A protein has these predicted regions:
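A conserved beta-strand-loop-helix scaffold within acyl/acetyltransferase catalytic domains
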Residues: 22-182
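Conserved acetyl-CoA pyrophosphate-binding loop and the N-cap/start of the following alpha-helix
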Residues: 10-20, 182
Length: 182
């Protein structure tokens, strides 16, 4: 969510705060500091040494009348509804099923599979992964009902997954991946 990130009473104090962040980052041997999704009126505060991060986020909101997936489809035109139904039928015919697993239900194999999928996605896109398997174990233990894995299964074998975190009435999905299939 975009909003104020540099909490200071005026631009002079905000620049001093950012200078302190820069100095602390350098003094601690860190490669960078990030202030994401700041308000547009804070743009002028980020001068030399700060890079703009261009990013895209997708937010899906239920207008309140979708209680089922069929309710959701009913709001689409015929072509899109038909395409989605055909895609889902193709997945079903392929024998793929889905498991929804909370952190306290996740087995070692579930966490390892999700971590493999996550690593594969980062390798495919040439990025450095930040999450370790130990971190997934930490999430499962500390956020047992907030951590949610959606695993696509080919028989007993997980072939794809999404890692989500649940908060209140919102589901945050950020990490996903899948096995290479023939």
């Amino acid at each position: 969510v975009t909003g104020p990130r540099v909490l200071a009473r005026d631009p002079e104090h905000a620049r001093a705060l950012l200078a302190a962040v820069t100095a602390w980052t350098a003094a601690n041997g860190l490669s960078s500091a990030h202030i994401n999704f700041h308000a547009a009126d804070e743009d002028a505060l980020f001068e030399d040494g700060w890079l703009l991060r261009e990013d895209i986020q997708y937010h899906w909101t239920n207008p309140g009348h979708w209680q089922t997936f069929d309710d959701y489809l009913a709001d689409m035109d015929h072509k899109h509804r038909k395409n989605i139904r055909q895609e889902r039928a193709k997945v079903t015919r392929a024998g793929i099923t889905f498991r929804v697993v909370h952190g306290d239900e996740a087995s070692e194999a579930d966490l390892q599979a999700m971590h493999r999928f996550y690593l594969q996605t980062f390798m495919d896109y040439g990025n450095a992964p930040a999450l370790t398997l130990e971190f997934l174990h930490h999430l499962a233990a500390r956020l047992p009902r907030q951590l949610l894995l959606v695993l696509a299964m080919d028989g007993e074998r997980p072939v794809a997954g999404a890692l989500c975190l649940r908060g209140g009435d919102t589901l945050y999905g950020r990490y996903w991946g899948g096995a290479s299939l023939p």
